């Protein structure tokens, strides 16, 4: 619950998923907090159901990738522009613009929630400004889609200059375009998991098997929420990063006649531990 102060009393308001998203966005963008750290400790986030958590993940991650583009769009419909220091005004407009332009959420749901948030955090007068700007975005959506600046505008200025100098403007445009796409996640399944369990796990993730024990998926929730996480039945590791261990295992089998479980391997600089898990999964110490 949050408190909305009025002239005579304090009214308690239930936090919707978009309100939780706004508060998380303020912490991420203005206070440089890590998204993963926030949601682990957030009572409001953990109170959401699975569907709302997935939506919040998608929304915040899209905001992190495209907030500069969103700001340029809504500032087009603001007479004087919205200053960065106006945290909640910017936050409400970024989150709403992302929903309208990139996530294609129904305008009524977005505008109604945005106006309510504005009334809570920045007052009645500013809520009218929010409503006016977002209505213009809805009315002129096709113009907004044509107006969207290149993806590279989302890159920090120092990084854009460095990459342009090193790779050239054309290549930087392509790098930035790819950087805006949600990255797939590779999940490596332990030998403990039966084939039937692996196939069911793949279906639950809406993923595809790219190697005998690797499922690639587009996860929209916390990995800790997936079954088998606490039991060590799987771990996160890019498919390409498995190659060194696979080569090592091949050489061990080729050159050592003794049982593989008598071989000891020193894994130097092993954080975050994907290769270590891979070695342990193959019964190496």
PLM region spans:
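Non-catalytic accessory regions of SAM-dependent methyltransferases
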Residues: 1-138, 148-149
